[in-house]
């Protein structure tokens, strides 16, 4: 009988304990566990969102870098093209200047040749007059001398 009363006392104590735990502890513990579960789930979701955002940011950074490289390559290409154009313009300007100098030099040479011819004609005329004077052994007057010079110039 002692065993039965003790057993019944333990059962009653256990029942009170179950009721007490169920009434006062189980609800708050369950709520705490649910809140913790929710926080963990929210943390995992935030981590996943952060990972996704990081991947998007990396993708945007790669695209921006790629665009910058393309733009830089385009700028370099344009600069090289412009440099080639400048070189061609300089070559053309140098050729035009060379041609102008050549024409100027040719004109100057032509003028010098014409001056030399005129000087030579004058000398030839003087020599011819002197020769004619010696041949004729007489001096010609100025008008006759001038006519003789014109005739000699026409023949030369």
UniProtKB/Swiss-Prot annotation:
UniProt xrefs under Pfam families: ATP-synt_B
NCBIfam families: ATP_synt_b (TIGR01144), PRK05759.1-2 (NF004411)
Subunit structure: F-type ATPases have 2 components, F(1) - the catalytic core - and F(0) - the membrane proton channel. F(1) has five subunits: alpha(3), beta(3), gamma(1), delta(1), epsilon(1). F(0) has three main subunits: a(1), b(2) and c(10-14). The alpha and beta chains form an alternating ring which encloses part of the gamma chain. F(1) is attached to F(0) by a central stalk formed by the gamma and epsilon chains, while a peripheral stalk is formed by the delta and b chains.
Signal sequence interval, chain numbering: none
Membrane-spanning ranges: 1-21
Alphabetic keyword roster: ATP synthesis, Cell inner membrane, Cell membrane, CF(0), Hydrogen ion transport, Ion transport, Membrane, Transmembrane, Transmembrane helix, Transport
Family, as annotated: Belongs to the ATPase B chain family.
Membrane-topology annotation of the record: Single-pass membrane protein
Name of the protein in question: ATP synthase subunit b
Gene Ontology MF terms: proton-transporting ATP synthase activity, rotational mechanism; proton-transporting ATPase activity, rotational mechanism
Gene coding for it: atpF
Compartment annotation: Cell inner membrane
GO CC annotation: plasma membrane; proton-transporting ATP synthase complex
InterPro entries: ATP_synth_B-like_membr_sf (IPR028987), ATP_synth_b/b'su_bac/chlpt (IPR002146), ATP_synth_F0_bsu_bac (IPR005864), ATP_synthase_B_chain (IPR050059)
Function noted in UniProt: F(1)F(0) ATP synthase produces ATP from ADP in the presence of a proton or sodium gradient. F-type ATPases consist of two structural domains, F(1) containing the extramembraneous catalytic core and F(0) containing the membrane proton channel, linked together by a central stalk and a peripheral stalk. During catalysis, ATP synthesis in the catalytic domain of F(1) is coupled via a rotary mechanism of the central stalk subunits to proton translocation.
Principal location: membrane
């Amino acid at each position: 009988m002692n065993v039965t009363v003790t057993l019944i006392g333990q059962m009653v104590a256990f029942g009170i304990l179950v009721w007490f735990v169920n009434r006062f502890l189980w609800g708050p513990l369950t709520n705490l566990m649910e809140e913790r579960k929710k926080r963990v789930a929210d943390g995992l979701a935030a981590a996943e969102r952060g990972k996704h955002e990081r991947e998007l940011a990396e993708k945007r950074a790669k695209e921006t870098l790629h665009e910058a490289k393309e733009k830089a390559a385009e700028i370099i290409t344009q600069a090289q093209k412009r440099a080639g154009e400048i070189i061609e313009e300089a070559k053309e300007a140098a050729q035009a200047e060379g041609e102008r100098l050549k024409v100027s030099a040719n004109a100057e040479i032509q003028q010098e040749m014409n001056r030399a011819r005129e000087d030579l004609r004058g000398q030839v005329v003087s020599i011819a007059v002197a020769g004619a004077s010696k041949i004729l052994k007489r001096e010609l007057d100025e008008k006759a001398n001038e006519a003789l010079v014109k005739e000699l110039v026409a023949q030369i």
